[in-house]
């Protein structure tokens, strides 16, 4: 165990011990919790917080919502001040290890019944085998396809059945028959063209491992044969087969490309479904599972917004009640209805079966239970992601895949060394 982790376990052990004996919040007590949350619209946040206060009249929530572009930097400044503000804060799940290793998250194992949650969601909130961020929502990628474009090309579309999941090779073959690059018509696009969340599953499908088990070494992992092969295949989508639009790094533009009939297939999040239906009402599209390599295995990305407890908060009973209540079945149903992230609580799928009676949600639930793999747990995820994003852009532009990955791995190792 490295010194950073050892120091952290001493702090976390004391905090966890305190939490394990925290009683339910007494109504006679009064508390105000400072909460930093994502800057989602009023109608997706305020009803949830109001419901918590209604259920817990002795606890008031002072909620500060921050836009995505400011959230991470603002949290860094505040948490590095090592004060009790905020008591509760939103956590992008791959940053769990980073926050936990630096002593910014309370261990939550005493408050969470692991049997209630999907395995992938729990894994996304863990560091060194302990839960540090509460799994409040997950994500899943599905393959959207334009039925009219498939029909015009005489191609049988993929089925909404995991047992009949398309391979990447099948996808490219179909995409080449529908792409017309000179006319800005494309066969396929990733929603997030240069983000590890979207693209790591390609190498993982071939058995690749994105990082060492301790999250501190990239060389020999992200630059290994599986990722070189997978990202060479990805590169050819742009440079040789020309089925994918180059340079589309704005995640708001790729759904537009698909919705406007300029792209036959889009690999994107479940949340895009509602956008496509509302914004492109004449678009006739179908949904199928995430592809995999013929000689590999299916792997899908997962992870989304969690929340955590500041271990320096003096409001132990109130923060514990926030965790318990927000992770209840009722509150998770309410949260899904406000903002439909993939549910992490198993009971939600059963309680709201009618809502999930569609290809989209049947696929998402099945993937979450069988193929979902969170991003690698490392205290240096921000550095890891930034370096890999640059390398992915270079590869898509035609640069040497092996050289790009070797260089990226070396840079990652230098950055991750500071956490040893």
Model-inferred region functions:
Residues 132-136, 141, 167-219, 226, ...:
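Extracytoplasmic/periplasmic solute-binding protein
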Residues 92-142, 169-172, 198, 202, ...:
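Hinge/lid segment of periplasmic solute-binding proteins
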Residues 32-47, 66, 139-140, 376-380:
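Extracytoplasmic "Venus flytrap"
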Residues 29, 281, 288, 336-390, ...:
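Long, aromatic- and glycine/proline-rich binding clefts that accommodate carbohydrate-like moieties
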Residues 173-177, 216-248, 290:
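Glycine-centered hinge/linker elements that transmit conformational signals in sensory
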Residues 144-147, 302-314:
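A bilobed periplasmic-binding-protein/Venus flytrap-type ligand-binding module shared by bacterial periplasmic
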Residues 1-17:
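N-terminal secretory signal peptides and thylakoid transit peptides that target proteins
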Residues 51-119, 131-133, 148-154, 158, ...:
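Extracytoplasmic "Venus flytrap"/periplasmic binding protein-like
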């Amino acid at each position: 165990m490295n010194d950073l982790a050892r120091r952290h376990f001493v702090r976390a052990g004391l905090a966890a011990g305190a939490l394990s004996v925290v009683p339910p919040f007494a109504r006679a007590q009064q508390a105000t919790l400072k909460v930093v949350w994502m800057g989602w619209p009023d109608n997706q946040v305020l009803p949830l917080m109001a419901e918590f206060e209604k259920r817990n009249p002795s606890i008031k929530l002072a909620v500060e919502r921050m836009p995505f572009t400011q959230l991470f930097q603002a949290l860094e400044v505040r948490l590095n001040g090592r004060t009790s503000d905020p008591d509760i804060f939103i956590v992008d799940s791959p940053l769990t290890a980073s926050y936990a290793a630096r002593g910014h998250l309370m261990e939550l194992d005493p408050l969470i019944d692991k049997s209630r949650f999907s395995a992938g969601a729990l894994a996304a909130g863990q560091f060194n085998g302990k839960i540090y961020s509460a799994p409040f929502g997950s994500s899943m990628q599905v393959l959207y396809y334009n039925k009219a474009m498939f029909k015009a090309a005489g191609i049988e579309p993929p089925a909404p059945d995991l047992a009949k999941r398309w391979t990447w090779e099948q996808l490219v073959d179909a995409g080449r028959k529908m792409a017309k690059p000179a006319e800005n018509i494309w066969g396929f696009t990733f929603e997030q063209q240069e983000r590890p969340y979207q693209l790591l599953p390609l190498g993982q499908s071939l058995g690749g491992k994105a990082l060492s088990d301790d999250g501190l070494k990239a060389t020999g992992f992200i630059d290994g044969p599986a990722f070189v092969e997978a990202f060479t295949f990805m590169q050819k989508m742009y440079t040789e087969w020309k089925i994918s639009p180059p340079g589309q790094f704005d995640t708001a533009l790729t759904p537009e490309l698909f919705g406007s009939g300029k792209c036959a297939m889009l690999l994107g999040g479940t949340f895009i479904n509602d956008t496509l239906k509302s914004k492109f009402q004449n678009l006739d599209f179908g949904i199928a599972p995430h592809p995999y390599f013929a000689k590999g295995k299916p792997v899908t990305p997962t992870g989304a917004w969690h929340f955590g407890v500041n271990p320096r908060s003096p409001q132990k009973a109130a923060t514990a009640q926030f965790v318990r209540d927000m992770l209840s079945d009722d509150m998770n149903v309410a949260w899904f209805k406000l903002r439909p992230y993939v549910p992490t609580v198993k009971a939600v799928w059963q309680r709201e079966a009618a809502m999930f009676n569609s290809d989209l949600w049947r696929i998402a639930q099945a993937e979450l239970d069988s193929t979902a793999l969170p991003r690698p747990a490392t205290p240096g995820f921000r550095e890891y992601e930034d370096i890999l994003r640059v390398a992915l852009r270079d590869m898509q532009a035609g640069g040497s895949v092996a050289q790009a990955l070797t260089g990226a791995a070396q840079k990652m190792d230098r950055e991750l060394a500071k956490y040893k």
